[in-house]
Structures are given as structure tokens and as C-alpha cells.
Amino acid sequence: MKRVLVVVLGGTLAIASSALAFHDAGVAHCNGCHTMHNSEDGMLVDGDSPNGNPWLLRDATPSDVCLSCHAARHGAVFATDPLVPNTEYGGGDFVFLTEDNLNDGHGGATNAIDGDAAGHNIDAPSRGVGADGTLTSSPGGSFPASILGCTSCHDPHGNENFRLLYGIGGVQDGQFTFTAAAPVADGIANINGAGESFTNHTAYHSGMSAWCGNCHG
């Protein structure tokens, strides 16, 4: 009997340990991102979508949901002020997309560069940003700008790749296909601690450029 109990308890602990992993190549907590009926304690979860949305998300778009956790912590990729960006951990800072003039150089005031040119234009209405207003596809490639978001590159349901990046196969519900594998790299272990530095930074081993080429040729 004791042996049976040990086995059962061991199995239970293993399941619990796996379930505690939100994105860590394990079981994501569904209700962290999704809501079945857009209702919680008698209140709307997503007030902007009273009838819900196609993905049963807790916010309008996948990127909105991602940023509810990752904007100010767990990577801090979207600051509140483009003039005071967050400490860099890698991707972002997407707040530069909201800047009215990116040109800080000589004559910048008369040669303005809109924030639309800051980088990856993710669709996140809650942060005041949307699809690229100029480009219809990724520079050098053919990824549709209209569908770009956090989950275009990162798998929200978890995988074993660096930063949950997609490998070879379909992305965005099959609307685009990656032909290069995810890169091999070691990232900063504590993304809520100190930011990038000469001694604390991501180490890229192989495949990063090829992976970027999935979208950029």
C-alpha cells in the first residue's frame, strides 16, 4: 500500500509541476489568456468585445493579451513613454511605435520620421498601435503586415525553442509558413532582473539570421 501511495503522490506532483509552467514548454493556464463566456464575477472580462472575439481571448487581440503580462514585467517590452524606455532584455521596446518623431538627429524637427517606422508593428489596440500604415509586407520578404503580432513569432501555447519561437511549419493559423528552424541561443535567465549588459546578455549560437529570413528573405 505504501508503495502504491508513493507512486500516486509522485505522479500527482509531476502533473502539478507541469501545470505550473505557463509558457515553459509545458501546460499553459488556459484562463490566463482565454475566457469562455467573456464573464467573470458578473463582469465583462473584455469590455471592448461584449460579444467575445474569434479566439475567446481576454482582450481584443493576441498581442493585447501578451502585453497584459509582458509590457511592464516579464520582459518589459512596452514602456509607457517612448522618451523613457524600459531596460532592454531583447525584443522591443514597442513603445517607440507611438513616437511622433523618431528622428533625433540634426534637422530632425523638419525631417520627421513617424513611429510607424520603429520596427515590428504589432496589432495591439489597447496600447494604441496597429498594423503598419506604410508597408504591406515584411521588408525583403512576404509576411503580411496586416496580421503581424506577438504570436506571429512566439508560440503562446509553449514549445521547447528559445523564447518560444516557432520552428519550421505554419504560423498565424496557416497564413504563413516558416522554412527555417528556430535559432539556438541562451537568453537572460531572470527577465525581471538587470537588463542587457556586456556580462548579462543573450548568447546566440546558431540560426538567428536564417530564422529572421523566414519573414525578411
Residue ranges and their predicted role:
Residues 1-4:
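Positively charged n-region of N-terminal signal peptides that target proteins for export
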Residues 6-14:
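Hydrophobic helical h-region of N-terminal Sec-dependent signal peptides
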Residues 16-18:
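N-terminal signal peptide c-region/cleavage motif recognized by signal peptidases
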Residues 20-217:
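A motif-centric signal for short, conserved binding hotspots located
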